A protein has these predicted regions:
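Membrane-interface "cap" regions at the ends of multi-pass membrane proteins
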Residues: 1-18, 23-28, 41-45, 57, ...
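Membrane-helix boundary/coupling elements in multi-pass transport proteins
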Residues: 15, 56, 79-93, 196-209, ...
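Membrane-interface loop-to-helix entry segments
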Residues: 96, 109-166, 196, 220-224, ...
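TM-loop-TM module centered on a large, flexible mid-protein loop between adjacent transmembrane helices
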Residues: 62-64, 69, 100-101, 219-285, ...
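Transmembrane helix-loop boundary segments of multi-pass membrane transporters
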Residues: 20-25, 30, 94-109, 129-138, ...
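Helix-loop-helix junctions that connect adjacent transmembrane segments
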Residues: 29-30, 107, 139-268, 272
Length: 386
């Protein structure tokens, strides 16, 4: 559980989407990741207070329902399902972008269709795919990012053989630290949120453990470490090694750094790791969207026939419905191949921002209600809340 909590949702949002963030904010992309990370961190603490005080069966929409009524629960529930359906689409397009480097003659839409079909079949055949693969995927991603930080950090400081001196000046050369202005840095923060999608699931899962207070506190701490080490530090390495205006918005800057450093085979290995990360998050998104649909059915907000399962207990209909947006993205990738992925990333970031704001608003209402009626249940409190 701890390993999945640290590396589970690291996918295209970091490995590929960071290129678009750097293109918007320049070296100040580091600030965008810090701002988004702070928003996520405090949101998880607010969510953690509600999870411990008022267990809601793993559904964020339940807290919106408790705070603002059934309509709010309905909107947040379907909004959350829609977000993960879009994540399925984004990760499929990202996987196609990576595969396209090895088979340049094949169009991106065909590769996106191949990735999406393969993962759909894998999830429909066996419900155990998620549990059996996610821990391994997380281990690969954690190891790869640590290696990237070591190699890239040494190169940026001029301590790597053949580096030719420190490249840290890339942080303020080429137009300055925030070459596009600070408004662009704030705009990039919304795109950054895509990279943090999934961290909220771990908090709710920890709340369902035998010791919810300890589990939630540990989950939030793990997220803090991940924000600092995986996101902020790795982006700092990228913009220190590469001039920001050479970073491709649709190609992994992590691979570009390894190519720049020139370690034999490192770029290929990183390309494989990025592809594994994309498959990992695509796998998790299919699982999560189907689980969210079951929650909507339980609440009476979705038709019951969508909850049908196969003889092996696989929620086939829920999984297939969660891939509909992905197949629409395949068509869009055929028509607008250069615009699909940035659009999907921005859409996911906007949905997550709304979700996080609703979680915080729900905590204000639910938290105040619990403080008045059952203050003894507040064993885990939101910081700075009266």
């Amino acid at each position: 559980m701890a390993l999945i909590a640290i590396g589970g949702s690291v996918g295209a949002g970091l490995f590929i989407g960071s290129g678009a963030v750097i293109g918007l904010a320049g070296p100040a992309a580091v600030v965008s990741y810090v701002l988004a990370g702070a928003l996520v961190f405090f949101t998880l603490r607010a969510l953690g207070e509600m999870v411990v005080a008022v267990p809601a069966g793993g559904s964020f929409s339940d807290y919106a329902r408790l705070a603002f009524g059934p309509r709010a629960g309905f909107m947040i529930g379907w909004g959350y399902w829609w977000m993960y359906a879009v994540v399925v689409a984004a990760e499929s397009v990202a996987g196609a972008t990576i595969l396209g480097g090895g088979v340049p003659g094949v169009p991106g839409w065909a590769l996106a269709l191949l990735v999406l079909l393969s993962m759909t079949v894998a999830n429909v055949v066996s419900v155990r795919v998620f549990a059996e693969t996610e821990s391994f995927f997380s281990m690969v991603k954690v190891a790869a990012i640590v290696a990237f930080l070591v190699v890239g950090g040494l190169w940026a400081l001029g301590l790597w053989s053949g580096s030719g001196g420190s490249s840290v000046a890339n942080l303020w050369q080429h137009g300055g630290f925030a070459p596009q202005g600070w408004v662009a840095v704030l705009a990039a923060t919304v795109v950054v949120l895509f990279a943090f999608g999934g961290v909220e699931i771990v908090t709710v899962a920890a709340g369902e453990s035998a010791e919810p207070e300890r589990g939630v506190a540990l989950a939030v701490t793990n997220v803090l470490w991940r924000i600092g080490l995986f996101y902020v530090a790795s982006i700092a390495v990228v913009v220190a090694v590469l001039p920001w205006d050479t970073v491709d918005a649709v190609r992994s800057p992590f691979v570009a750094v390894m190519e720049h450093v020139g370690v034999p085979g490192a770029a290929v290995i990183m390309e494989v790791v990025v592809f594994v990360a994309v498959l990992s998050v695509l796998n998790a998104a299919m699982y999560t969207s189907s689980r969210m649909l079951f929650t909507l059915i339980r609440q009476g907000d979705a038709p019951r026939f969508l909850g049908g399962t196969s003889g092996r207990g696989v929620p086939v209909r829920a999984i297939l419905l969660g891939t509909v947006v992905g197949y629409a993205a395949v068509v869009a990738d055929y028509v607008w191949p250069e615009r699909v992925f940035p659009f999907l990333v921005s859409s996911i970031g906007a949905i997550l921002l709304i979700l996080f704001l609703v979680i915080c608003a729900s905590q204000l209402v639910v938290g105040a209600r619990v403080r008045r009626r059952e203050p003894q249940r507040l064993t885990l409190r939101m910081w700075a809340f009266p």
